């Protein structure tokens, strides 16, 4: 199965696992937004520290604007393979296409590490 058109770079599984862990920690000790509408608002307002986008969203148009918007606002974003796993990490009973960490809380070090790794990955793919 090929990647969705909005997936701009490959995220290694170990990094994706750290992303979900960061979302869980931030949910408990910081502040997150769940769902594409809330995530989009957080990005537009410049509140998001990290945006997480699921790779298995259908139709793709639901989240296709997020990478472009994040780049425009200089907000880092990362992908996870499953909207179901992202929903669970957010504490939801349902899947979510995207989420944003506004205040990382106890996940601050993890979020910083994720952003550093994402920048390294994006640096390799953009050249």
UniProtKB/Swiss-Prot annotation:
InterPro entries for the chain: eL8/uL1-like, Ribosomal_eL30-like_sf, Ribosomal_eL8-like_CS, Ribosomal_eL8/eL30/eS12/Gad45, Ribosomal_eL8/Nhp2, Ribosomal_eL8_arc
Induction: Constitutuively expressed (at protein level).
Classification via SUPFAM superfamilies: L30e-like
Keywords, comma-separated and alphabetical: Cytoplasm, Ribonucleoprotein, Ribosomal protein, RNA-binding, rRNA-binding, tRNA processing
One of the protein's GO biological processes: tRNA 5'-leader removal
Annotated compartments: Cytoplasm
GO MF annotation terms: ribonuclease P activity; rRNA binding; structural constituent of ribosome
Quaternary structure note: Part of the 50S ribosomal subunit. Component of box C/D small ribonucleoprotein (sRNP) particles that contain rpl7ae, FlpA and nop5, plus a guide RNA. These sRNP particles form homodimers, giving rise to an asymmetric holoenzyme. Probably part of the RNase P complex.
Family: Belongs to the eukaryotic ribosomal protein eL8 family.
Annotated NCBIfam families: eL8_ribo (TIGR03677)
Name the UniProt record assigns to this protein: Large ribosomal subunit protein eL8
Organism of derivation: Saccharolobus solfataricus (strain ATCC 35092 / DSM 1617 / JCM 11322 / P2) (Sulfolobus solfataricus)
Gene giving rise to this polypeptide: rpl7ae
